[in-house]
Amino acid sequence: MLVKNNQIAELEDTLIRNNIFEKFNLNRVGVFGSAARGEPSNDIDILIEDNVNYRSLAALRDELQSLLNKRIDIVIARYANPIILHRAMKEIVYVTKH
């Protein structure tokens, strides 16, 4: 697991400031890919381990894209391709509500 960087700190601040955890009933959000590694990127890859229906998932993605001005790719852990999930878990950084 990697450590929080500026991109993740910005995401965490946005999630907390906009009550995203409460609004979408999330306990934590995992960040993986280039954002987790601190590399420049125009998207953020997010792993959701909570039960989220597809309508809520689309609303979450749309709201985060609007707030962060970045493309958001969301993977739901229970439906994820095992190879993608394995790679994500190697570098995941979790953001939680405090």
Predicted features, each with a name:
Residues 1-30, 36-41, 49-98:
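Catalytic core of pol beta-like nucleotidyltransferases
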